[in-house]
Amino acid sequence: DPLDGTKEFVHRRGDFTVNIALVEKGIPTRGVVYAPAKSRMFFTQADGQSVEEIGDFAKDQLGETKAISVSNPDNSALMVVASKSHRDQATDDYIGKYGVRDMTSAGSSLKFCLVATGEADLYPRLGRTMEWDTAAGHAVLNGAKKISPTLTLSPMHRALI
């Protein structure tokens, strides 16, 4: 997805991303999520581990990286990240079932990356979504050792992260 978070981009909010993914047999195996306005880039390495590039970005060489990992959440005090543009009553009702310590909004596939880094514990997405919007973030999340919830959906169509 060359521009995920179009509304955020148009309204000059920094939560848009550029996404690149490799999907093999329906499974997102490699992903890159770049948030240029936030100077953050996350990607899955060849060994499957996800990292965040930190420091100055150089177009000709990879900068310093750090491994990322999901949090070990306290289910009675979750940090929730939800969509700015696609939040609805069903999402609010779902969030209401959990003990929420704090909640933040973010746009684009950046939400996947906030869960992948442990900055958030839960990203509920109950509405329709497209593969090109989720594949890169899903791969980054998988590489951060996130175990996706068991749902009766294919790996590319999980509703809850």
Predicted segment positions?
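Short aromatic-hydrophobic micro-motifs that form the base-stacking/packing surface
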Residues: D1, V32, P124
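Short glycine-centered, acidic/aromatic-flanked micro-motifs in structured strand/loop junctions
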Residues: P2, A82, L126
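Acidic beta-strand-loop-alpha-helix segment within the catalytic core
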Residues: N19-C113, S154-I161
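Oxyanion/phosphate-interacting regions
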Residues: S71, D92-K97, K111-I161
